[in-house]
Amino acid sequence: MQIGIIGAGKVGCSVGKYLQENDALRKAGYHITGYAGRRKESVEEAATFTGTTPFYLLSELVKKNDIVCIATPDSQIKTVWEELCKFSLEGKIVCHFSGSLSSDLFTGREKKGVSACSVHPMYAFSNRFTSYEQLNTVKLTIEGDPKAVAVFREIWNLCGNETGVVSTGKKMQYHAAAAIASNLMIGLYAKSVRLLEDCGFAGEEAENFLRPLVENNIRRMLESSPEEALSGPVERNDAETVQKHLQTLQGSDRTVYLALSEEVLSVAKKKNPQRDYRELERLLREDRRQ
């Protein structure tokens, strides 16, 4: 099956290069043909980088390919789809790579004879020409029509990547989970740095003090489980310390501490099912109501 990519940015270049270089994929009959996009220069750079063809007309890319991948920014995907609908799409598979948008974006696809899906690599692309080198370790989540999902699972599994399937209705929740693990964790770290700065630590000094703690805890969690890695006042049922923390924190710092302590309490209960956390649970619940 021939695969064309619309969009020659970080995602388009990285995915195209990675798939193009995979021998198992080529042997299975999948081939990247080339790129189309708004900027001629970017399209030509992507085609040269991947050893494929620059398509200067969208109609030519559509005509040439069985699978059309939209690798544009989220705000442009709907517009690209509307442009695609001007051409014959019968029997084709269309996908986009947005993490937050679902295949519902491809309105009217049934009438066009299209099978569609969204494919989201759990990875933060940082460079058009080097990010592909890390894609062999990336997991991907696929959502959409059964035929399209099956084809893209085969494509990525042939490359050795693990894939998961999420329902259309859960796509935004899935993306929120990824954002919490990736983006919001950075915000949490930045908040900790700022609190230490308020205690008199300089910015770099605060980070140097926190770094071993963060690295060791994340390593333990990833190598074992959240339950095994968990320690601290909530885990050991130290309601007095938790109460003092809440008394010293203000505003959003206090709100975040309270919300995450409730989540950590759920983990602590799994780790220590014999321990009575009712006093701590009552403290967090009553504090949240204030």
PLM regions and their residue ranges:
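NAD(P)+-binding Rossmann beta1-loop-alpha1 motif at the extreme N-terminus of oxidoreductases
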Residues: M1-E60
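Short, well-ordered alpha-helices that flank and scaffold nucleotide-derived cofactor binding pockets
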Residues: C13, K17-E21, T48, E82-K86, ...
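Short, hydrophobic beta-strand segments that form beta-sheet elements in well-ordered domains
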Residues: T33-G37, V94-F97, I142-E143
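Short, polar loop motifs at secondary-structure junctions
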Residues: R38-S42, G99-S102, P146-K147
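Internal alpha-helical scaffold of NAD(P)-dependent oxidoreductase catalytic cores
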Residues: S42-F49, G113, T130-E223, E279, ...
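Rossmann-like NAD(P)(H) cofactor-binding subdomain of soluble oxidoreductases
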Residues: F49-T130
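Interdomain hinge/lid region at the active-site interface
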Residues: R219-R275
